[in-house]
């Protein structure tokens, strides 16, 4: 089960500016399954490149950007601090998003959630089928690169679907707490599904880890 700390993923992965000087470097998280475990829905080549190359690049570039930011803070160089914001957002978002994404998937996934999450989905979207249709449509409809998300609106106490461009993190962009993210960057599917994003969306539902999504919902909805 996830702790309530799961509600603050971005705060946990991107350290406060006040502790940048003593921070530990970010590292690439291990996958909770083998690269080929999600086949035939997502093949091993995609998973290996996606995790060991793309996510690793976000981690490395985030560490570089944070080190440069620390130096700019020490020098009082506000211009440099401002110039580094896009790199921090892009690479920090990439690290946050993918760290959630890997745990949202499972070789034993698919089907429907149970319990409180399923009831919340029915309450906020009418039915699981309608929810699935809406999140699929939002994800397919992302122009260029980005993510489709199921998030929790803490203030309103309800689930919401949203899209984020590029690697913009859901919580930092919309305030929604991320529960389920679907990566629709081409690197997530092109080697297997070419330019047919809807086929990738149809396949990914077979490996959604509803236990993980439910744990995130439980941690954030109390």
Curated annotation (Swiss-Prot):
<dbReference type="InterPro" id="IPR019831">
    <property type="entry name" value="Mn/Fe_SOD_N"/>
</dbReference>
<feature type="modified residue" description="3'-nitrotyrosine">
    <location>
        <position position="58"/>
    </location>
</feature>
<keyword id="KW-0496">Mitochondrion</keyword>
<comment type="subunit">
    <text>Homotetramer.</text>
</comment>
<feature type="modified residue" description="N6-succinyllysine; alternate">
    <location>
        <position position="68"/>
    </location>
</feature>
<feature type="binding site">
    <location>
        <position position="183"/>
    </location>
    <ligand>
        <name>Mn(2+)</name>
    </ligand>
</feature>
<feature type="modified residue" description="N6-succinyllysine; alternate">
    <location>
        <position position="122"/>
    </location>
</feature>
<protein>
    <recommendedName>
        <fullName>Superoxide dismutase [Mn], mitochondrial</fullName>
        <ecNumber>1.15.1.1</ecNumber>
    </recommendedName>
</protein>
<dbReference type="GO" id="GO:0030145">
    <property type="term" value="F:manganese ion binding"/>
</dbReference>
<feature type="modified residue" description="N6-acetyllysine; alternate">
    <location>
        <position position="122"/>
    </location>
</feature>
<dbReference type="InterPro" id="IPR050265">
    <property type="entry name" value="Fe/Mn_Superoxide_Dismutase"/>
</dbReference>
<feature type="transit peptide" description="Mitochondrion">
    <location>
        <begin position="1"/>
        <end position="24"/>
    </location>
</feature>
<comment type="function">
    <text>Destroys superoxide anion radicals which are normally produced within the cells and which are toxic to biological systems.</text>
</comment>
<keyword id="KW-0560">Oxidoreductase</keyword>
<keyword id="KW-0809">Transit peptide</keyword>
<dbReference type="InterPro" id="IPR036324">
    <property type="entry name" value="Mn/Fe_SOD_N_sf"/>
</dbReference>
<dbReference type="InterPro" id="IPR019832">
    <property type="entry name" value="Mn/Fe_SOD_C"/>
</dbReference>
<feature type="modified residue" description="N6-acetyllysine; alternate">
    <location>
        <position position="68"/>
    </location>
</feature>
<keyword id="KW-0007">Acetylation</keyword>
<feature type="binding site">
    <location>
        <position position="98"/>
    </location>
    <ligand>
        <name>Mn(2+)</name>
    </ligand>
</feature>
<keyword id="KW-0464">Manganese</keyword>
<feature type="binding site">
    <location>
        <position position="50"/>
    </location>
    <ligand>
        <name>Mn(2+)</name>
    </ligand>
</feature>
<feature type="binding site">
    <location>
        <position position="187"/>
    </location>
    <ligand>
        <name>Mn(2+)</name>
    </ligand>
</feature>
<dbReference type="GO" id="GO:0004784">
    <property type="term" value="F:superoxide dismutase activity"/>
</dbReference>
<dbReference type="GO" id="GO:0005759">
    <property type="term" value="C:mitochondrial matrix"/>
</dbReference>
<keyword id="KW-0944">Nitration</keyword>
<feature type="modified residue" description="N6-acetyllysine; alternate">
    <location>
        <position position="130"/>
    </location>
</feature>
<comment type="similarity">
    <text>Belongs to the iron/manganese superoxide dismutase family.</text>
</comment>
<feature type="modified residue" description="N6-acetyllysine">
    <location>
        <position position="202"/>
    </location>
</feature>
<feature type="modified residue" description="N6-succinyllysine; alternate">
    <location>
        <position position="130"/>
    </location>
</feature>
<dbReference type="GO" id="GO:0006801">
    <property type="term" value="P:superoxide metabolic process"/>
</dbReference>
<dbReference type="GO" id="GO:0034599">
    <property type="term" value="P:cellular response to oxidative stress"/>
</dbReference>
<dbReference type="InterPro" id="IPR019833">
    <property type="entry name" value="Mn/Fe_SOD_BS"/>
</dbReference>
<dbReference type="GO" id="GO:0006357">
    <property type="term" value="P:regulation of transcription by RNA polymerase II"/>
</dbReference>
<dbReference type="InterPro" id="IPR036314">
    <property type="entry name" value="SOD_C_sf"/>
</dbReference>
<feature type="modified residue" description="N6-succinyllysine; alternate">
    <location>
        <position position="75"/>
    </location>
</feature>
<dbReference type="Pfam" id="PF02777">
    <property type="entry name" value="Sod_Fe_C"/>
</dbReference>
<feature type="modified residue" description="N6-acetyllysine; alternate">
    <location>
        <position position="75"/>
    </location>
</feature>
<dbReference type="Pfam" id="PF00081">
    <property type="entry name" value="Sod_Fe_N"/>
</dbReference>
<keyword id="KW-0479">Metal-binding</keyword>
<dbReference type="InterPro" id="IPR001189">
    <property type="entry name" value="Mn/Fe_SOD"/>
</dbReference>
<keyword id="KW-0832">Ubl conjugation</keyword>
